[in-house]
Amino acid sequence: MQKFLSLIIVILILYNIVKLKIYPEDNNNSTTIKQTTSNNSSTNEHQTSINNEPTISLNGNLFERTVSKIVINALKTEEGKIFFENILQPLNGPINPNDYTIEVHKDLVKTLFKINTFGSGNIGPASCGHVVTVFYQISDMNNNLISEDTKTFTLGSAPVMLGLDNVIIGMMVGEAREAIIPAKYTVNNSNNIIFDDAYNYKVTVILKSILPQNFVESNKVKIYDDEIAYRVPLLCGEKVSFHAKITRLSNGKILFDSKSKGQPLDMKIGDITYPLIFSYALQGKVQVGTRSVIAEGKTFKALGSNLNKIIAHESLPIHEYLLLELNDFKQIK
């Protein structure tokens, strides 16, 4: 289905380019008419409830109308929005002509939750598995306050809602964020807090503290994907099966390889008995291809735990750079 959609989009783009070159005046007139109509529209139309979607009039021949309907229906879902946005992802990053590896610049989680960040801080950033203290407010889409509290919890445990944990990731102490949590990410592990999973929610959160203060500095980590993303990404608190390989860059020595052991890893993103860099790399990854991560050895320590299920701390070259390769992803329900 995704290949079919990609083919349709490519055909539609080419069709419109040709049409634009042949009938430039018609397209300009159309733009003028649309702008005039838009300027004369009543402001009341913008106050329509998000649940009352306006009827869209489709023009053009049968092919154009059919493609338009497919695109419109796809864009009504979070998966569709992520898919269409990432079709253009290669344009946002350099491509290595040798292996077509794309450096990751696009944060799909910010897109998914429509995150806006305010203020600044110098302690952080928060990663999945950190223990954080936050003040949060949750409102419906009409800004009616539903819940507010100051709470301390482990990112990935989802005591309030899974989406909130993922909005906090990447924050510095003192920063504030606003976001919209899609209905499917309002699930939590609390019996005291219940949200209607048929609606989206607005959240505002202020990060007050992070423990322990072991951080992955984004400017010292390089992440590469060898396939274009076109699915909803993995999130903090979700479970995933995958293969991992750790290589010492200075001499090429393999320090860990799950494939050679014949057994994939089953991990909840945020598990503090795994290396911190694992949660950092998995959060926001789509389940395709191989993700390659170059990071300092110290980030391969388990977060806040002397138990490391992957590699013993005493054998880690903490001041050297290591290569982590993750692939064969399969989400565990």
Swiss-Prot record:
Pfam families attached to this UniProt entry? FKBP_C
For this chain, one GO molecular function annotation is:
peptidyl-prolyl cis-trans isomerase activity
The enzyme's first-digit EC class, named in words, is isomerase
Q: What is its EC number?
A: 5.2.1.8
Catalyzed reactions: [protein]-peptidylproline (omega=180) = [protein]-peptidylproline (omega=0)
Q: Which residues form the PPIase FKBP-type domain?
A: 129-227
Task: Report residue spans for region: Disordered.
Answer: 29-51
Question: Which GO terms fall under biological process for this protein?
Answer: protein folding
Q: Which InterPro entries does this chain map to? A: PPIase_dom_sf, PPIase_FKBP_dom
What keywords are annotated for this sequence in UniProt?
Isomerase, Rotamase
What name is this protein filed under? Answer: Putative peptidyl-prolyl cis-trans isomerase RP395
Task: Provide the organism lineage as a comma list.
Answer: Bacteria, Pseudomonadati, Pseudomonadota, Alphaproteobacteria, Rickettsiales
